């Protein structure tokens, strides 16, 4: 396979992996809540959703900041 064809295939696979399911069903949200943010750093987009974070971490949204954080659990 030519390098151009390989790059096209890689691009299509990347695009496919980023798309949500056609059925409209998103993955369920992970349990727990995001802890409060202690300070205000510059805008960062570390994640898109809970499933772009490792393990049990959640994708937490603080204004223009999206970052993976360990969840807190409230009784």
UniProtKB/Swiss-Prot annotation:
<feature type="disulfide bond">
    <location>
        <begin position="53"/>
        <end position="68"/>
    </location>
</feature>
<dbReference type="Pfam" id="PF00095">
    <property type="entry name" value="WAP"/>
</dbReference>
<feature type="domain" description="WAP">
    <location>
        <begin position="27"/>
        <end position="72"/>
    </location>
</feature>
<keyword id="KW-0044">Antibiotic</keyword>
<dbReference type="GO" id="GO:0045087">
    <property type="term" value="P:innate immune response"/>
</dbReference>
<keyword id="KW-0964">Secreted</keyword>
<feature type="signal peptide">
    <location>
        <begin position="1"/>
        <end position="24"/>
    </location>
</feature>
<protein>
    <recommendedName>
        <fullName>Porwaprin-b</fullName>
    </recommendedName>
</protein>
<feature type="disulfide bond">
    <location>
        <begin position="47"/>
        <end position="59"/>
    </location>
</feature>
<dbReference type="InterPro" id="IPR050514">
    <property type="entry name" value="WAP_four-disulfide_core"/>
</dbReference>
<comment type="similarity">
    <text>Belongs to the venom waprin family.</text>
</comment>
<dbReference type="GO" id="GO:0004867">
    <property type="term" value="F:serine-type endopeptidase inhibitor activity"/>
</dbReference>
<comment type="function">
    <text>Damages membranes of susceptible bacteria. Has no hemolytic activity. Not toxic to mice. Does not inhibit the proteinases elastase and cathepsin G.</text>
</comment>
<dbReference type="GO" id="GO:0005576">
    <property type="term" value="C:extracellular region"/>
</dbReference>
<dbReference type="InterPro" id="IPR036645">
    <property type="entry name" value="Elafin-like_sf"/>
</dbReference>
<dbReference type="GO" id="GO:0005615">
    <property type="term" value="C:extracellular space"/>
</dbReference>
<keyword id="KW-1015">Disulfide bond</keyword>
<dbReference type="InterPro" id="IPR008197">
    <property type="entry name" value="WAP_dom"/>
</dbReference>
<keyword id="KW-0732">Signal</keyword>
<feature type="disulfide bond">
    <location>
        <begin position="43"/>
        <end position="64"/>
    </location>
</feature>
<dbReference type="GO" id="GO:0019731">
    <property type="term" value="P:antibacterial humoral response"/>
</dbReference>
<feature type="disulfide bond">
    <location>
        <begin position="34"/>
        <end position="60"/>
    </location>
</feature>
<dbReference type="GO" id="GO:0044278">
    <property type="term" value="P:venom-mediated disruption of cell wall in another organism"/>
</dbReference>
<keyword id="KW-0929">Antimicrobial</keyword>
